[in-house]
Amino acid sequence: GYRKPPFNGSIF
C-alpha cells in the first residue's frame, strides 16, 4: 500500500 487510507492496499 501507499499513502494513507483509503489508498492503502494499492501498490504504486
Curated annotation (Swiss-Prot):
GO terms, biological process: neuropeptide signaling pathway
Main location: secreted
Subcellular location(s) of the protein: Secreted
GO cellular component: extracellular region
Modified residues (Phenylalanine amide): 12
Top-rank taxon, per record: Eukaryota
The protein's name in its UniProt record: FMRFamide-like neuropeptide FLP7
